[in-house]
Every structure is written in structure tokens, then in C-alpha cells.
């Protein structure tokens, strides 16, 4: 992996900086590094592809070195360099695609393609110029089974889940009470509702709770908590649990009371926040517990009183809600992230070249299914292909 990164970084710098008119002295160190890369690669043959519709390609390296000059780089010099650069970039692109197309149930973090395994050989260790990439550092740590720390912004940690539970129900579905939620990506929205607006509840208060277990623990998370769930703020028709009928939900939004959010790790409470909204932080957690109340307003204007009658029919449904959004966090496992294109890059390559479904990843790289059953094998393979995708993204946009 270090060799692949060093090759890509060298090629990116060469493509950007070896241009006509540049003083040789300004790029002399880069050209020496470039020549070291050529010397190491010359005389070697590689093969990529041969999986799905990814074509088999053979690569032979036999390039001359870039010379020195006392003046600016001229057009001929740059053209010679450009021919070499483009061949190397094409090679790296195909190595990366070949690697992203492959998976293994055992030692999935190690190189899987023939070309990538060859690049991992001892003779290429001289190509090791700059390995400051966060992904490379974490890949090295994970490869040695040591602690890693990926920093994510809006991590896709929650598998998609959208449903409801009813704590009070009737065949006519005309006096319901319960919760509904939507968990996806880095956000939880949950709403508690009571058609009768807690008219018969103790102290006219209904209590709601929503618990979400993460597939991987997060640390040092910055979180936004809001006393609203906008996705449940408009009327809708909902299929009943048994699919036999549908019921009407017509929310009128109230502010939730006694809001409490707990962050737990292995069943132990790590952080607790009560009636605190906006930005909060959580130190270390693998479970989130949200609890909140719907209180029937003790004093109402005639207009509000008309919304919440003492008896049926209940045409408007009292609703309270919360939104919890993870803005950034650290995780020891690699995750898809809304601010990165790595999952999209890997999925696009696998779809474009009709890569057959293997023993590790789900069809179409379905993220909800992948994160729901996030096995160590999937984690290893995902870290490898994401690292390769991050390297490829330096050269291929």
C-alpha cells in the first residue's frame, strides 16, 4: 500500500509541476525522485484485470530517465516526461480498479490482485517517499492489528431504519399512541404521538423512548440535538403493521418535555444530557438512548383547545420529536462518510465492470446491509478498498 501511495503521490506532483517554463532547480528533487521510481519499475512486467468485465492488460516498464538542465524545462523535455507520467498513471488506475474489484474472507486487508501483491514485494520498497496519508497510517496500524483512528464528518453509522411502534391501538386505528422513527446515515429522527394528546395519561403526560445500537463504537463525537423531527411534521398515510389496512397521521407539533439523551458503552452510561439542545459532545459510546415526553398543555387558547378535544374523533394528532445528528466523530473502523466519495468510487468501479458478487460484500455494495452485518472480514476488505480508492482519487477525478 505504501508503494502504491508513493507512486501516486510522485505522479501527481510530477503531472502538476513538470510543466513547460518551470525552472529545473525548482523541481530537481522531484525529478530525482521520479527517476528513482523509473529505475525501480524498469524491467518489471505486470498484469491487471481479468475479473468481471475488467479487461486483462499487460504492462511493461522500460523508460529512460529524465535528464538535467541548467535552464527552464522546454517543450521536448515536458513531452518526454508526460509520456512516461501518463503510462504510469494509467497503470496505477488499473491496479486500483483491479484491487477494488476483489475481496477475500481471510486476511482481506492484504493485497488481493496479482499486480498489487507484486508491488508489495521487497524490491519495490525503495519507492517509499511520502506516507503521511491518514488512510495509509491507519491501514498500517490495522494491518498490524493495532488501534486505529479514522476521523469522520457525518459518518454513515446508522443503517437505514424507518418504522413505528404502537403502544395503543384499535382495529379502526382512530386513537393511536406510539413512536415512529427514521434512522439513516448520521441522523436519527424520532417522534412520539398521541391522538388524544395524553388526555387519559397519568398527569396528562406520555413517555417515549428510542434506543439505537451502533455497529461500531464512536469516540469524541460532536453532535447536534434538536427538539423537533421535521420529517414527521406533515400528514401522511401509513401502512398498518400487518399490511391489512392504512391509517392517517395528521400531526400537530408540540415541544417535547423532559428530554434526556444518554450515550452508553457496553451498557454503561458515559454521557447524559438533560434538556440541552444544540451542540453536545459524547466521549465514547456504542448505544444512544433518547427519552422524552408529550405533555398535554395545561392552558390552551380556544383555537388550541379545539385541536385537542376531550373525546373522539381526534382529527389532529399531538406529536413531539427529536433530531440527533452526528456531525463528526472518530472510529477505529473505516466507515462510509457523507463528505467522502470512497464508497461511491468503489461501487462505481464494481458496477461499471460488472464485478460478480463475492464472498464478502453484498450485491451492489448495499451500505445498509453491509453496516448492519459489519463483520471483521467486511471491515478488513473495506479498509483495503477504501485506502486504494483514496490513492486512486489523487490521480483520477
Swiss-Prot record:
<keyword id="KW-0106">Calcium</keyword>
<dbReference type="Pfam" id="PF00980">
    <property type="entry name" value="Rota_Capsid_VP6"/>
</dbReference>
<dbReference type="InterPro" id="IPR001385">
    <property type="entry name" value="Rotavirus_A/C_VP6"/>
</dbReference>
<dbReference type="GO" id="GO:0046872">
    <property type="term" value="F:metal ion binding"/>
</dbReference>
<dbReference type="InterPro" id="IPR008935">
    <property type="entry name" value="Virus_capsid_a-hlx_vir"/>
</dbReference>
<dbReference type="GO" id="GO:0005198">
    <property type="term" value="F:structural molecule activity"/>
</dbReference>
<keyword id="KW-0832">Ubl conjugation</keyword>
<dbReference type="InterPro" id="IPR008980">
    <property type="entry name" value="Capsid_hemagglutn"/>
</dbReference>
<feature type="binding site">
    <location>
        <position position="286"/>
    </location>
    <ligand>
        <name>Ca(2+)</name>
    </ligand>
</feature>
<dbReference type="GO" id="GO:0046789">
    <property type="term" value="F:host cell surface receptor binding"/>
</dbReference>
<dbReference type="GO" id="GO:0019031">
    <property type="term" value="C:viral envelope"/>
</dbReference>
<comment type="similarity">
    <text>Belongs to the rotavirus VP6 family.</text>
</comment>
<dbReference type="GO" id="GO:0039626">
    <property type="term" value="C:viral intermediate capsid"/>
</dbReference>
<feature type="region of interest" description="Interaction with the inner capsid protein VP2">
    <location>
        <begin position="62"/>
        <end position="73"/>
    </location>
</feature>
<dbReference type="GO" id="GO:0019064">
    <property type="term" value="P:fusion of virus membrane with host plasma membrane"/>
</dbReference>
<keyword id="KW-0167">Capsid protein</keyword>
<comment type="subunit">
    <text>Homotrimer. Interacts with the inner capsid protein VP2. Interacts with the outer capsid glycoprotein VP7. Interacts with the outer capsid protein VP5*.</text>
</comment>
<keyword id="KW-0946">Virion</keyword>
<comment type="function">
    <text>Intermediate capsid protein that self assembles to form an icosahedral capsid with a T=13 symmetry, which consists of 230 trimers of VP6, with channels at each of its five-fold vertices. This capsid constitutes the middle concentric layer of the viral mature particle. The innermost VP2 capsid and the intermediate VP6 capsid remain intact following cell entry to protect the dsRNA from degradation and to prevent unfavorable antiviral responses in the host cell during all the replication cycle of the virus.</text>
</comment>
<protein>
    <recommendedName>
        <fullName>Intermediate capsid protein VP6</fullName>
    </recommendedName>
</protein>
<keyword id="KW-1154">Intermediate capsid protein</keyword>
<keyword id="KW-0479">Metal-binding</keyword>
<feature type="binding site">
    <location>
        <position position="266"/>
    </location>
    <ligand>
        <name>Ca(2+)</name>
    </ligand>
</feature>
<feature type="binding site">
    <location>
        <position position="153"/>
    </location>
    <ligand>
        <name>Zn(2+)</name>
    </ligand>
</feature>
<keyword id="KW-0862">Zinc</keyword>
